[in-house]
Amino acid sequence: MARVTVQDAVEKIGNRFDLILTAARRARQLQLHTREPLVAEEGDKPTVIALREIEEGLINNQIMDQQEKFDAIVQEVAEKEAISFLADVQANS
């Protein structure tokens, strides 16, 4: 089990309040399994993993925003392809 010093994570994010928001957001992703951890889990809870990722500079709000934008684009493309496929199937029926 890794020890996390919050001060190191605060230095990466800027202030404690943003750290709390960022860590909570990342921990939620890990808890819901919408994202894989970027560090070894080592039996740690999602909140500790999130803090370790932040401390190592692997995660911040900008990175998570970019990931979510990418996911939204991928989902939109998949939905358009599905609609196109269904329209083709219906037209050929």
From Swiss-Prot:
The name on file for this protein is DNA-directed RNA polymerase subunit omega
Q: Which GO terms describe its molecular function?
A: DNA binding; DNA-directed RNA polymerase activity
According to its UniProt record, what is one Pfam family this protein matches? RNA_pol_Rpb6
Q: What is its EC number?
A: 2.7.7.6
The catalytic activity, as recorded, is: RNA(n) + a ribonucleoside 5'-triphosphate = RNA(n+1) + diphosphate
Its cellular-component GO annotations read: DNA-directed RNA polymerase complex
Which SMART domains does the record associate with it? RNA_pol_Rpb6
Question: What is this protein's gene name?
Answer: rpoZ
Q: Which family does it belong to?
A: Belongs to the RNA polymerase subunit omega family.
Q: Subunit composition?
A: The RNAP catalytic core consists of 2 alpha, 1 beta, 1 beta' and 1 omega subunit. When a sigma factor is associated with the core the holoenzyme is formed, which can initiate transcription.
Its GO biological process terms? Answer: DNA-templated transcription
Tell me which InterPro entries the record gives.
DNA-dir_RNA_pol_omega, Pol_omega/Rpo6/RPB6, RPB6/omega-like_sf
Annotated source species? Glaesserella parasuis serovar 5 (strain SH0165)
Highest taxon of the lineage: Bacteria
Record keywords, A-Z: DNA-directed RNA polymerase, Nucleotidyltransferase, Transcription, Transferase
Per its database record, what is this protein's job?
Answer: Promotes RNA polymerase assembly. Latches the N- and C-terminal regions of the beta' subunit thereby facilitating its interaction with the beta and alpha subunits.
Q: What class of enzyme is it?
A: transferase
